[in-house]
């Protein structure tokens, strides 16, 4: 297959691949939140122990909303001039880093 036929067959799939990637990330964050909730309800540390699970749920929700926005942006033709989600990626990366720190701190208690 040459480059032109690959590009022609790939037309429109960028939005689906992007949505799948963001959705997988959201699902991983959601599973993290569920596992933290199960661990913390078993340990009965009180409501403060559920903070990491809440953060994971919030990060998963944000990630899913970003996935929907990205799919909508990439489905427009012609593509918008700026299609990189820099601000969204920074927000989500910060949320994941905060989640990691809070989870690590909660595990130490």
Swiss-Prot record:
Residue stretches spanning the membrane: 18-38, 48-68
Membrane topology per record: Multi-pass membrane protein
Entry keyword Transferase: no
Gene Ontology CC, one term: plasma membrane
Subcellular location: Cell membrane
Keywords: Cell membrane, Membrane, Transmembrane, Transmembrane helix
Pfam families in the cross-refs: DUF202
Principal place of residence: membrane
Descriptive protein name: Uncharacterized protein Mb2296
Top-level taxonomy: Bacteria, Bacillati, Actinomycetota, Actinomycetes, Mycobacteriales
């Amino acid at each position: 297959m040459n480059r032109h036929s690959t590009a022609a067959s790939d037309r429109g799939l960028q939005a689906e691949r992007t949505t799948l990637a963001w959705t997988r990330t959201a699902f991983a964050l959601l599973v993290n939140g569920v596992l933290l909730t199960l661990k913390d309800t078993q340990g009965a540390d009180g409501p403060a122990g559920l903070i990491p699970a809440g953060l994971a749920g919030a990060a998963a929700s944000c990630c899913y909303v970003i996935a929907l926005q990205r799919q909508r942006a990439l489905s427009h033709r012609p593509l918008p001039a700026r299609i990189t989600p820099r601000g969204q990626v920074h927000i989500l990366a910060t949320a994941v880093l905060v989640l990691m720190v809070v989870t690590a701190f909660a595990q130490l208690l």
